UniProtKB/Swiss-Prot annotation:
Lineage: Eukaryota, Metazoa, Chordata, Craniata, Vertebrata
Signal sequence region: 1-30
Family: Belongs to the LRRTM family.
Function: May play a role in the development and maintenance of the vertebrate nervous system. Exhibits a limited synaptogenic activity in vitro, restricted to excitatory presynaptic differentiation.
LRR repeat locations: 63-83, 86-107, 110-131, 134-155, 158-179, 182-203, 206-226, 230-251, 254-275, 279-300
Descriptive protein name: Leucine-rich repeat transmembrane neuronal protein 3
Tissue and organ distribution: Expressed in neuronal tissues.
Organism of provenance: Mus musculus (Mouse)
Amino acid sequence: MGFNVIRLLRGSAVAVVLAPTVLLTMLSSAERGCPKGCRCEGKMVYCESQKLQEIPSSISAGCLGLSLRYNSLQKLKYNQFKGLNQLTWLYLDHNHISNIDENAFNGIRRLKELILSSNRISYFLNNTFRPVTNLRNLDLSYNQLHSLGSEQFRGLRKLLSLHLRSNSLRTIPVRIFQDCRNLELLDLGYNRIRSLARNVFAGMIRLKELHLEHNQFSKLNLALFPRLVSLQNLYMQWNKISVIGQTMSWTWSSLQRLDLSGNEIEAFSGPSVFQCVPNLQRLNLDSNKLTFIGQEILDSWISLNDISLAGNIWECSRNICSLVNWLRSFKGLRENTIICASPKELQGVNVIDAVKNYSICGKSTTTERFDLARALPKPTFKPKLPRPKHESKPPLPPTVGATEPSPETDVDTEHISFHKIIAGSVALFLSVLVILLVMYVSWKRYPASMKQLQQRSLMRRHRKKKRQSLKQMTPGTQEFYVDYKPTNTETSEMLLNGTGPCTYSKSGSRECEIPLSMNVSTFLAYDQPTISYCGVHHELLSHKSFETNAQEDTMESHLETELDLSTITSAGRISDHKPQLA
């Protein structure tokens, strides 16, 4: 009994002693599993954008993925990743790596994805990738590679995609990809490659996509690719290719897309260029220097469902007719911006419209071009006159170099004029609608001002009606009026003698001026006779005739003149007696 108790005490004592050691070991392993400044998600370690110049040494041995992107690493040392046996992917892009040791990737045989893009690597040793034979994806793009070793990718038999984009490669060694039998994507775009050897792609029996765009190829020979029996997409846009040829009789049945846009292709070397690609579905020939395409080439495009031909220098002559006829019968996708570049009269006109409107493909004998002056469409404003019916005559022989305009042009002009009429009527309707809307809004927002406008308009109408009624009431006969303007001599004689000669003018106008009734002040301070309007311009009343008004006015004027003369004579006598009294 006592021995059992002692044993239990001893066991508990051992446990108490070992517990701190176990805890310290666990803490140290935890600290080693996630380095300082990094982010750990399970067995994935992300040490990104930390300006690291060295790879942390405290990374857990069970790490499956390590990302060291956007740091300042400059080189990879010998056995740099020793101890990371479980690592399956490694991201080292966007660093300053310029030197990689030949044995830097020792000990990570399970690695499947290696990203070294956007660094400063200028070369690789032949044995650099030998320890990572299980690679599936290798990205070496955006570096400064000038050349590749002949055994650079030896042993990478499981590689599926290889990216060498945006480097400075000028040549590709022969059979460099011979061990890459499972490679499906090869990207050699944006380099300085001028030519390729025939055995460059030897062994690549499963390649499906090949990028050779933005290089310096001057010609393309489809005989370079007979070993690429599984290739489906070939990208060779934006090179300097001017000629496409085929020097080998073989059938490339796997190719489905060919991109040759942005080159300098002027013509095809022979009618059998595209006969070796019977299953071609998508062809890009835009932005080249093609002027026409022969009927033999068009006949070889038997399986196309998408074509791009814009941006070429198409010559709209009879040579273009075969292409236009083919485009009209083509049922796939195509661009409608196929524009004429010559002759000068048709620059900027759509090729199909030019052939349709100007009868380029009409019957002609010797010349190919058409006479533009005879082929111009008729103006829309010219009226159509009925054609007289003549007796049937034998047809005249066609003139050389001229074609009769097609009747389709008249139909087009009729459609254009009809559309203009519709557009004008719609514009007129919209303008009227806007005016009504403005009036309605102003009526709702400013009702007082609208009422004032209505009252003013009613007053104007009332005045207008009143004037018309007065005009109807005035007599139509013309009356004569006397205009009397006395002179200075006549005035003095009238003052002294009481009578004197006078002159007056007789006129037949309704608007006249007569002198006012004269009094003493008028004669004493006389500069110009004061005038007033006659009574003709007063409104005529229906119960009072004009003659009575005139008689009353004359009687009043006579009375006023008699009074004035009496006052003048009395004033003269008083002035005569004054000197005598003096």
